[in-house]
């Protein structure tokens, strides 16, 4: 009996001695299982709005800023398919009901823990003006994803894009996804991209540095700028985007070609007519994924 007690006493001493090490090993294994084997959590909900906290604001100009909103966990992702957008909602003084508008983040699911919105504040823009009133720590109501466009690698051979002003945001999302998935980066996307980007003044060209960096590193992406009020010595287009510019700088109509449009309504309307006159399939009032001319 005494031998049994002695043996158990020795065993207890061993357990006490090595217990901290066992706890540490278990903790490490648990952490590995949580961070190494689990997929990032997608937080968007298409059926209900959720509140996200503004964590950072970066002013780009007097009326343009990038708003960074935190996701609940640093490992969370928005869960937004490439080509889709989100709805923002706010109660605005003087409006009879909640105002809802669509925006495309300039960040992607490759960046965890937050999402970025590039917003230009228009005098008549309810949501854009509302965003300028937000302070760090304030919340914004967001729902999604939504939209008919879901980009997949090599869905067509060549994409032509026409963007005006903040209409560059869905284009940038797709451009970055294509370049990120090039063969040299371990992917398989060989889609060519040509972009016509229209603005009023040269200083209005949003995300210009990022766009030109992408064009410099990728020979499958080209940009043609168009300005209403070009400065002296400007070597891009001037005035409004014309059918002649589209013919010169975008891919010709073909089954494996898609044209994407996003910008102010008058511009999009004019571009629908211009593309149709050049032989592209007539754009529908509400675009579908399979359309040759797709309007965001």
UniProtKB/Swiss-Prot annotation:
FAD binds at residues 132-147, 158-195. It comes from Aspergillus terreus (strain NIH 2624 / FGSC A1156). This is NADH-cytochrome b5 reductase 1. NADH-dependent reductase for dph3 and cytochrome b5. Required for the first step of diphthamide biosynthesis, a post-translational modification of histidine which occurs in elongation factor 2. Dph1 and dph2 transfer a 3-amino-3-carboxypropyl (ACP) group from S-adenosyl-L-methionine (SAM) to a histidine residue, the reaction is assisted by a reduction system comprising dph3 and a NADH-dependent reductase, predominantly cbr1. By reducing dph3, also involved in the formation of the tRNA wobble base modification mcm5s 2U (5-methoxycarbonylmethyl-2-thiouridine), mediated by the elongator complex. Belongs to the flavoprotein pyridine nucleotide cytochrome reductase family. GO terms for molecular function: cytochrome-b5 reductase activity, acting on NAD(P)H; NADH dehydrogenase activity; transferase activity. The chain crosses the membrane at residues 11-31. InterPro entries: CBR-like (IPR001834), Cbr1-like_FAD-bd_dom (IPR008333), FAD-bd_FR_type (IPR017927), Flavoprot_Pyr_Nucl_cyt_Rdtase (IPR001709), FNR_nucleotide-bd (IPR039261), OxRdtase_FAD/NAD-bd (IPR001433), Riboflavin_synthase-like_b-brl (IPR017938). One of its GO terms (biological process) is tRNA wobble base 5-methoxycarbonylmethyl-2-thiouridinylation.
